[in-house]
Amino acid sequence: MWSAGAIEITLVDPRTPPVAALVRELDRYMTGLYPAESNHLVDLDTLARPDVRFFAATSGGETVGCGAIMLKDVYAEVKRIYVPPRARGLGLAKLILARLEQETRTLGLRLRQGL
């Protein structure tokens, strides 16, 4: 099991190899949970657009979580929050969501969660 050290949550390009690998892991996880018609997975190129803020949580050089907001006119929609099983139970998802909330407030928007 992975153990938490200093966690950094930073704005990143989701196409970088370790982050893209985590997004692919999330895709596999979501595909196993929901039927194709219910899965509205946002691809890496979309996540890299200027209207998306994508964050990765890292510790000791390892990517241990991610999350994004997609900017709309008056709100930001939460996308792609994920913490892999090896890093769960340490509160990382809360930290990632708090960072997304902070970014949303900085932009003067409201936060909305999509499914």
Question: What does each model-identified segment do?
Answer:
Residues 1-17:
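Conserved N-terminal entry element of GNAT/NAT acetyltransferase domains
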Residues 23-30, 34:
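Hydrophobic alpha-helical core bundles mediating ligand binding, dimerization, or RNAP-core interactions
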Residues 33-42:
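A short, aromatic/hydrophobic, helix- or strand-capping loop or linear motif
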Residues 45-56:
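A short helix-loop-beta-strand connector motif used in the catalytic cores of GNAT acetyltransferases and
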Residues 56, 62-71, 77-82:
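Conserved beta-strand in the GNAT
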Residues 83, 89-102:
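Conserved acetyl-CoA-binding loop-helix of GNAT-fold acetyltransferases
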Residues 85-88, 113-115:
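Conserved beta-strand-loop-alpha-helix junction that forms the acyl-donor binding cleft
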Residues 97, 104-115:
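Conserved GNAT acetyl-CoA-binding A-motif
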